[in-house]
């Protein structure tokens, strides 16, 4: 009951904050806020240069793989558990997911810079 109440309270509070942020209007919209700022000087060039989507996708892929590898870090401490088969099954499942996602990225040419 305590856990359910905590989850409900957290969900309700997060939803309330999202709704407030969504429905609150942008009160002060000045042109100065939308202009680029370069240490008080006039901008040398356009601050709205197109961003490389390939770089963005590789960065997101790196973050996902980094998160999955971070999930593997507690495995040495988990090996001291009484239920070793469950731990090994979960570790194998996590490593399989990591290998399958790497294979998918490789076949979709998501790791190549030259294209």
Curated annotation (Swiss-Prot):
GO CC, any one term: NADH dehydrogenase complex
Membrane topology of this protein: Multi-pass membrane protein
GO molecular function: NADH dehydrogenase (ubiquinone) activity
Presence of keyword Transcription: no
A biological process from GO: mitochondrial electron transport, NADH to ubiquinone
Primary localisation category: mitochondrion
Record InterPro entries: NADH_UbQ/plastoQ_OxRdtase_su3, NDAH_ubi_oxred_su3_sf
Source taxon at top rank: Eukaryota
Keywords: Electron transport, Membrane, Mitochondrion, Mitochondrion inner membrane, NAD, Respiratory chain, Translocase, Transmembrane, Transmembrane helix, Transport, Ubiquinone
Reactions performed catalytically: a ubiquinone + NADH + 5 H(+)(in) = a ubiquinol + NAD(+) + 4 H(+)(out)
Localization per record: Mitochondrion inner membrane
EC number of this enzyme: 7.1.1.2
TM ranges: 4-24, 55-75, 84-104
Function summary: Core subunit of the mitochondrial membrane respiratory chain NADH dehydrogenase (Complex I) which catalyzes electron transfer from NADH through the respiratory chain, using ubiquinone as an electron acceptor. Essential for the catalytic activity of complex I.
Assembly behavior: Core subunit of respiratory chain NADH dehydrogenase (Complex I) which is composed of 45 different subunits. Interacts with TMEM186. Interacts with TMEM242.
PANTHER family the record matches: NADH-UBIQUINONE OXIDOREDUCTASE CHAIN 3
Family: Belongs to the complex I subunit 3 family.
Name this polypeptide is given: NADH-ubiquinone oxidoreductase chain 3
